[in-house]
From Swiss-Prot:
Organism name: Staphylococcus aureus (strain MRSA252)
Record: residues binding shikimate: 13-15, 60, 85, 100, 211
Protein name per its UniProtKB record: Shikimate dehydrogenase (NADP(+))
Active site: 64 (proton acceptor)
EC number annotated for this UniProt entry: 1.1.1.25
Lineage: Bacteria, Bacillati, Bacillota, Bacilli, Bacillales
Keyword Oxidoreductase: yes
Amino acid sequence: MKFAVIGNPISHSLSPVMHRANFNSLGLDDTYEALNIPIEDFHLIKEIISKKELDGFNITIPHKERIIPYLDHVDEQAINAGAVNTVLIKDGKWIGYNTDGIGYVKGLHSVYPDLENAYILILGAGGASKGIAYELAKFVKPKLTVANRTMARFESWNLNINQISLADAEKYLAEFDIVINTTPAGMAGNNESIINLKHLSPNTLMSDIVYIPYKTPILEEAERKGNHIYNGLDMFVYQGAESFKIWTNKDADINSMKTAVLQQLKGE
């Protein structure tokens, strides 16, 4: 079977390394490549994919929303998130999914077993935040709290959550067991501070969905304060494993995928 990841730029993507490691571990001769498709060429997506004879593909920045009009069906989780990161091509039909939310939550559950009873604060109200919130809301008992700079961002949400400003989030930080940053603050080249951690409880798990850099500024600050931290590496691996399951109906080798990504990160 043939797969790919599509984005612009895409040369930095670790998806090919991760998926190929999984194929090798499982003894599969499947292929996975990176395809750079600029925004101005995106209208040719059907033609490009058809020529490549792909069975499915991942889609990343800046095309996660742009792909939706080209799909024959969109899964509920992708509709909720307002973005697609996985496409299955079956019987000529394109079916869109979003595995980011379930990928993050599966990883988080592995390091925080009592997740269903946790009081959780999510920073940011974009697509990634929404996907994670919808997944958490399926089983977490306390009502989720989501903080954003502007309240207008919540107009597209139809989830029963506490909506607060970032300023209020700073005041009430001590009340949360887990704080999850889903904003771009802290990504490579972005040292913007999203929130002041002065009131962070020492028992709170601080998380960020970014894994490059391995420790974002907010994670470094929390670690200096003595908090446990959790980055986005597992989210990346588990979302990839979920994509593989959608394409092949097989379980991925999580360990081989994570090892391959870690080796690549250490080599950079």
